[in-house]
Design a protein with these regions (language model features):
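Active-site "cap" helix and flanking loop/linker of ATP-utilizing ligase/carboxylase catalytic domains
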Residues: 11-82, 93
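A cross-kingdom feature marking charged/low-complexity
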Residues: 142-166
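Short, flexible turn/loop "capping" segments at secondary-structure junctions
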Residues: 49, 98-103
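Short, conserved charged micro-motifs
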Residues: 4, 65-68, 113-120
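Short amphipathic alpha-helices in soluble, non-transmembrane regions
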Residues: 70-75, 119-127
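Short, well-ordered beta-strand elements within core beta-sheets of diverse protein domains
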Residues: 58, 104-112
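Short beta-strand elements
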Residues: 1, 5-14, 90
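Short arginine-rich
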Residues: 124-145
Length: 166
């Protein structure tokens, strides 16, 4: 039998978009945290976060993830410069244009006092990006909704129960 914590997924990098949620609320200097980790003095730092809700919605070109070749090379237009929009898979060309790289293009970050408020802000931000050639973009509209959160909570409870009785 296996006892204790079980690894179900492991990265040696920041998970994306999961890390965007956490880093968006981080008040402590990330460089200071990194230096403390390297010097093995993380216990000397107080990690502080804003007490807010964050929802991140990833906007991707049609074709992702199965046909990344179709999702590549489309010129990107962002209607507004927004600090709540994080560029992901995009390439800057020599002429200054930005084209899709074939994966998640932009992450729209909604921050609010509640998850529904943050979700609404992120959803609105998805409308500021388009592809000039008319190629379709998509994103998951269910991210941050009450129904998805309820399903995820139930799955987490089930995973805990299975873990306890294995």
């Amino acid at each position: 039998p296996v006892w204790g914590p079980t690894i179900i997924e492991m990265y040696s990098r920041f998970g994306d978009p999961e890390s965007v949620n956490v880093l968006s609320l981080l008040k402590t200097d990330l460089v200071e945290i990194s230096e403390a980790i390297i010097s093995e003095k993380l216990n000397t730092i107080k990690l502080e976060f804003e007490e807010k809700a964050v929802v991140v919605k990833c906007v991707s070109p049609e074709g992702y993830p199965e046909r990344r070749d179709l999702a590549k090379g489309h010129k990107v237009v962002v209607d507004e410069e927004r600090e709540e929009v994080l560029w992901a898979s995009a390439d800057l060309r020599e002429d200054g244009s930005i084209v899709s790289g074939g994966s998640r293009l932009i992450e729209c970050i909604g921050i609010g006092n509640t998850i529904p408020e943050a979700s609404e802000k992120a959803e609105k931000l998805t409308g500021v990006v388009r592809l000039s050639d008319g190629w379709k973009l998509f994103h998951r509209k269910d991210i941050g909704t009450e129904s998805l959160l309820s399903r995820r909570i139930e799955l987490a409870k089930l995973a805990r129960e299975i873990y306890l009785y294995r």
